[in-house]
A protein has these predicted regions:
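Cell-wall polysaccharide-cleaving catalytic domain and substrate-binding groove, primarily
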Residues: 1-177
Length: 177
């Protein structure tokens, strides 16, 4: 079992449907659209914990490469996965790439990487170099930096669509940690 996925399921909880939430009905953090994309045809209230776990692990842990990042940094992988469940994997992956680029001392520590939202060998190498250079303190700073990006993302979402104002307090409280 993956404690990150278990924690996300515990945080997301059971079935929720709020008409103002553009994600629609969710259960265990899985939107109906995502469940359907995985072949689930039942009522969202009936989505099992095991089905949700499998979807979360595939879409928000393995596919984006956060499982590989966990071999370098468990805290960074947790932050990326948790954000991805809430907003998709592209943004957290791109934030990581952007932060690694600006933390590299103008390319003196390692070359800039292309910001494409895909975790590949260059992103992994940049993260490995950063962590070797900055250590545990740098790891904690990187997690804070990712949280800064996530908070800014939520602020922009709420400002663009006022229906999201009812969600932003909870997003900041539960997701920007």
């Amino acid at each position: 079992m993956n404690p990150i996925i278990d924690g996300i399921i515990a945080l997301e909880g059971g079935y929720v449907f709020n008409p103002k939430d553009k994600g629609g009905a969710t259960h265990w953090g899985i939107t109906e659209a995502t469940a359907r994309a995985h072949g689930y045809a039942g009522d969202m209230r009936d989505l099992t914990h095991a089905e949700a776990y499998a979807i979360l692990e595939e879409d928000y842990w393995i596919k984006p490469g956060f499982d590989v990042i966990s071999t370098l940094s468990w805290p960074v992988s947790f932050e990326l996965c948790d954000a991805a469940v809430n907003i998709g994997a592209y943004h957290p992956s791109a934030w990581l790439q952007r932060w690694l680029n600006v933390f590299n001392h103008e390319g003196k520590r390692n070359p800039d990487i292309h910001v494409d939202g895909n975790i590949g060998p260059r992103t992994l190498a940049a993260l490995e170099h950063y962590l070797a250079w900055r250590g545990q303190e740098g790891e904690a700073v990187l997690v804070k930096a990712l949280n800064c990006s996530q908070g800014t993302y939520y602020l922009n979402v709420a400002e663009k669509n006022h229906n999201n104002e009812q969600f932003i307090y909870g997003w900041i409280k539960n997701r920007v940690t």
